[in-house]
């Protein structure tokens, strides 16, 4: 089954995304709280993972570092990555996209907008 990793240390934010995405037919979500856990899951189940949605501020490494590591690995270079942040820095979206994010959402965001963008990227 196609799987989306949600890398988010806030249970509330993760649950909101899960509810929005779990209604997509043929798609399941896995929530992980850190980039390290996400990389482990990708190396273990990489063939099933079709996208990553990550928060910017996470334990140990941030979402931009996770994107850097994914883009440096030939297996995950083209994996869609959506970045979510609570920061209001107007340059952050530009930096995220320049570093390889496929989309950027600022909190508060619309879960439906995240879902639409994910569906667009997976077509």
Show where each model-derived region lies.
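Conserved acidic carboxylate
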Residues: 8
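Active-site residues of response regulator receiver
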Residues: 55-56, 85
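Acidic, metal-coordinating helix/loop segments flanking the phosphotransfer/catalytic sites
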Residues: 31-51
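C-terminal output helix
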Residues: 109-118
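The feature encodes the CheY-like receiver
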Residues: 59, 89
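Two-component/phosphorelay signaling modules centered on CheY-like receiver
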Residues: 11-30
């Amino acid at each position: 089954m196609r799987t989306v990793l949600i890398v988010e240390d806030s249970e509330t934010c993760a649950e909101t995304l899960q509810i929005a995405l779990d209604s997509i037919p043929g798609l399941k979500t896995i929530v992980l709280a850190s980039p390290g856990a996400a990389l482990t899951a990708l190396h273990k189940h990489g063939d099933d993972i079709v996208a990553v949605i990550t928060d910017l501020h996470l334990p140990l490494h941030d979402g931009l570092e996770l994107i850097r590591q994914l883009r440096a690995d030939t297996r995950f270079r083209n994996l869609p990555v959506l970045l979510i942040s609570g920061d209001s820095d107007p340059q952050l979206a530009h930096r995220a996209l320049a570093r390889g994010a496929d989309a950027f959402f600022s909190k508060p965001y619309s879960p439906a907008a995240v879902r639409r963008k994910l569906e667009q990227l997976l077509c």
